[in-house]
Amino acid sequence: MLVIGNGRMITQDASNPFLENGAVAMDGNTIVMVGVTEEVKKVYPDAEFVDAKGGVIMPAFINAHEHIYSSFARGLSINGYNPQGFLDILDGLWWTVDRHLTLEQTKLSAYATYIDSIKNGVTTVFDHHASFGHITGSLNAIEEAAKDLGVRTCLCYEISDRDGMEKSRESVMENVNFIKHALADDSDMIAGMMGMHASFTISDETMALCNELKPEGVGYHIHVAEGIYDLHQCLKEHGKRIVDRLHDWNILGPKTLLGHCIYVNEHEMDLIKDTDTMVVHNPESNMGNACGCPPTMRMVQK
């Protein structure tokens, strides 16, 4: 039995949202009592007590769109690198990084990200991974770090045709194999999704392969309209907007995550809402890559 108390408690309970001097009692993985510190200690006098010392006690955060592979690129300066737009940033930085990662480097990147997450109150991480220099086994390498540190995590590999169809197919199988592995895990700490980069690097052939091989019961995790080129390419090559294309491929739904959604219109927002698809807002990334601002509040209103 464990009691954490003497903290300002945010409960997420509408009837009692805040306690100035709150405590929470836990029996294993189950919260058994929430209340004023002295009252909780009276009920569980023999429990181990952790003094929050006036800090905040609240449910942990969930990071719904992470890129573990980028953790060691923070603050990286590349000689001669002078991007003129988002595509230059992708090819000159992020795709260059992911093409050179080894399994060991992927695992170390996961440790760095998960430790940073724990320090900042994040206990669940949805990671969208890419390491095109070493695809097979990369999700298991990340899983090892997550299990070692006790972080709940949902992993996927970023399927893309950008480095050729052979690597694209290998990426599909990395997702499929990890999803099956995660579905067989009964720890409630590991899950998998079918990861996709973005519409502009995924052909209809690859879309069809993902649809065919994705195990039942899981969704997709994909970047949508992060840059304007993604939208322009989809209109030119497929004659439709990105969310419409995803809908036509049965990718939308309550288990699917759409990252960014900067350049979406009213119709696409309605389609996202009608299919109960989830959107992840990434303001720090959008600023860092100078991609723009999504219609976040409009989506919230809908």
Spans of model-derived segments:
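Active-site gating loops and adjacent loop-to-helix segments of metal-dependent hydrolytic enzymes
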Residues: 72-106, 163-164, 228-255, 275-278
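Divalent metal-coordination and catalytic microenvironments
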Residues: 7, 24, 29, 54, ...
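N-terminal metal-binding scaffold of metallo-dependent hydrolase/deaminase domains
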Residues: 1-43, 55-57
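Alpha-helical scaffold segments that flank or form the walls of functional sites
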Residues: 76-128, 133-151, 173-186
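Metal-coordinating catalytic core of metallo-dependent amide/deamination hydrolases
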Residues: 129-262
